[in-house]
Amino acid sequence: NFETFQKKYTLRTNLNYTSHGFHYYGLTQPDVDKDSIAQRYQLVNAQADITTNRGDTGAFNVKTTIDFRYTGTNSPSIDSLKDWKAKEHGFHINGLGSFRSGANLFYSNLGLRYNGYGYGIQDSILTLSDSGIVRKNTILDINPGIKSTLLSNKLVIDAGFKVSVDFANETRAYFFPAIYLQYAAAKNQVVPFISLSGQAKQSSLTGFYQENPFILPNLSIQNEINPYDIQLGIKGVVARKFSYGLVANFIKENNRAFFVTDTMISTGNKFTLVYDSLNHTKIEGRFGYQANKKLNIDFIARYHSYELFHEAKAWNLPQAEVIFNASYNLFDKFLVKAGLDMSFGRSAKVYGAGEGVTELNNQFVYDLGNVIDGNLTLEYRYNKRISGFVQLNNIASQRYLRFYNYPVMPISVFGGLTFKF
């Protein structure tokens, strides 16, 4: 990472590299050769942003952001098949211009997103169910708006719109509202708000891998469109230590991707994608406590309702979640973090009857069970540049199913050193 703060501009850069090797271990046959189920993802991500500092009122400021990424998988072990691997590169260029006049902030956002995904050799067939894929996708985003702060900063109105032009197999333009309204009453103790938005969500191999690394490297990738996302809620801060929030979300999700077990190419230890449209309702409540920057406590509870068009369930997604996080900072030397994640009501799609399987809408549904995952992190900061940490994951040693046929490790311990220059 690199940062520099100058009088007229601020520059930040970030470069990350990840090499993740693993096995597709979700097998029913334990005697499979490990090399045949090995995989490795290589990821490179470079980011940079520059922001002008020409003053607040009566000055035009610009923030430009550039994000580049590359993702690649291993080649098959057979030399003649070395080209049958996945490669993906993409970038996101975004420019935000703003001008403040009195209580009004005029802004316009212009963005360009590109994703190029390829697998194997284009127009070639390896097997009847495995062929070469090349998909190039570009999305142009335009988002102008006005943000006004009125009534002694109590009323905030952010009104604009967003146009996304999706250059895929067919060029399509989408129009989304971008409206936010809130009113702060009782010295910010009670802040009701409403939001109306939408988005064209660009899908990628990188994004699917980060959700589920056990996916096939050859995928049919389609973008997700959210025509609307309505939020109604209330939030506030009490006595400067306590914060709370309650919000209801109503989201229309078209072309949402779900992970299901592949039965065509793999032996059932990899996942492919099915797409469906749904109405998603989410209700979330949160509570926070902060004391003198030493103790922080956050508690979040969520409930989800999914109304799908074709699939019987929203595969792998929870119906309820409970998240608890706490941290304590002692003399800025010792930092203790504890977390607890719980998920309930997850289901997987299977293709036959069996133990734990029910039938719904002519589809077979497997109950994945509950997730109860606790973690603990201990960090010692020698100075501002050098620190060390130990992290314990799944300290309750629960062998819950992360995905179908994929139980997690009972407990894992990580440690490391951090150096800043």
Annotate each PLM feature.
Residues 92-94, 142-143, 230, 373:
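Short structured motifs
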Residues 26, 119-122, 204-209:
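Short acidic, glycine/serine/threonine-rich loops at helix termini
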Residues 15, 66, 90, 107-110, ...:
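Extended beta-sheet lipid-handling architectures
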Residues 1-92, 128-132:
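Flexible loop and strand-edge segments within Gram-negative outer membrane beta-barrel domains
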Residues 152, 156-421:
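Exposed, low-structure sequence patches enriched in small/polar residues
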Residues 1, 106-120, 133-166, 292-305:
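Surface-exposed extracellular loop regions of Gram-negative outer-membrane beta-barrel proteins
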Residues 75-92, 96-98, 103-113, 120-138, ...:
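Beta-strand-dominated lipid-handling architectures at cellular/organellar boundaries
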Residues 6, 55-61, 100-105, 150-155, ...:
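Edge/loop elements at the starts and ends of beta-strands within beta-rich repeat scaffolds
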